[in-house]
Regions:
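Juxtamembrane transmembrane-helix termini in multi-pass membrane transport proteins
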Residues: 2-73, 130-146
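Helical-face signature of the major facilitator-like transporter fold
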Residues: 8, 12, 110, 114, ...
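Residue-level hotspots within the lipid-embedded alpha helices of multi-pass solute transporters
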Residues: 12-16, 51, 118-122, 152-160
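Membrane-interface helix-boundary motifs at transmembrane edges
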Residues: 33, 37, 171-179
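Membrane helix-loop-helix hairpins that form the core translocation module of multi-pass transporters
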Residues: 37-112, 165, 185
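Transmembrane alpha-helical segments of integral membrane proteins
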Residues: 55, 156-172
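Selective transmembrane alpha-helices of multi-pass membrane proteins
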Residues: 67-98, 152-159, 174-205
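Selected transmembrane alpha-helices and immediately adjacent juxtamembrane segments
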Residues: 112-128
Length: 205
């Protein structure tokens, strides 16, 4: 049981720590929102999406989904469109004006964009299937539950912590220069993921 828990925690950390579109977006909204509670929608959405992907990976459902070419192509196309739009929305925001309410995205956009970088990112989905889904096959019964639950808990703690750190950075950035740089970097990372998806889509068609 203890081994399954440690395995789940380390595995989840290994997958979630690298700089990616999802992490960048959560951090960005933590920094941009005037109050921490303003970032709750993106935190909860990102964590819920990760929880869903982990469950699907452990249950083997996601593997079945990616064996359907038409569905895979549709996910790639929708994901590409969302990421391009999302990158543009973040790029054009102007936190340097010191009006963080203007720079921050609405709850609706936070939820929509968080879902797009989580559920419509083939790279993230394949990582979850290939690593967490495959690793879960080593366990059964209570150990499998502990392994799965541990990976989920790491996601929730990570996203709350990431947004909190972003909020502290945003509070310290009275001139708006750091937030401006964060927005530009965020948009570039998100567009980079979009290019990756576009290349994958090109190979499919």
């Amino acid at each position: 049981m203890f081994t399954a828990m440690i395995h789940g925690i380390l595995l989840a950390l290994g997958l979630i720590l690298p700089l990616g579109a999802q992490n960048i977006f959560v951090f960005n909204q933590g920094a941009s929102q005037p109050k921490f509670r303003g970032a709750i929608p993106v935190i909860v959405t990102a964590a819920c999406c990760d929880t869903l992907l982990i469950l699907l990976a452990v249950l083997g459902v996601s593997v079945v989904v990616f064996t359907i070419p038409a569905l895979q192509t549709a996910i790639f196309i929708i994901g590409l469109a969302f990421l391009l739009y999302m990158g543009w929305s973040i790029w054009k925001s102007k936190p340097a004006k010191l009006d963080r309410r203007e720079a921050a995205l609405s709850s609706k956009k936070q939820i929509m964009f968080a879902m797009s970088v989580s559920l419509l990112n083939p790279h993230a989905i394949l990582d979850t299937i290939g690593v967490i889904g495959t690793s879960s096959l080593s366990y059964s019964g209570l150990d499998k539950f502990i392994f799965t639950f541990s990976t989920m808990v790491v996601s929730w703690i990570w996203f709350f912590g990431l947004a909190f750190v972003g909020k502290k950075v945003g509070d310290a950035d009275t001139g708006g220069k750091i937030l401006t740089a964060i927005n530009k970097i965020s948009a570039l990372v998100i567009w980079g993921v979009a290019v990756y998806i576009a290349l994958k889509l090109f190979n499919l068609v």
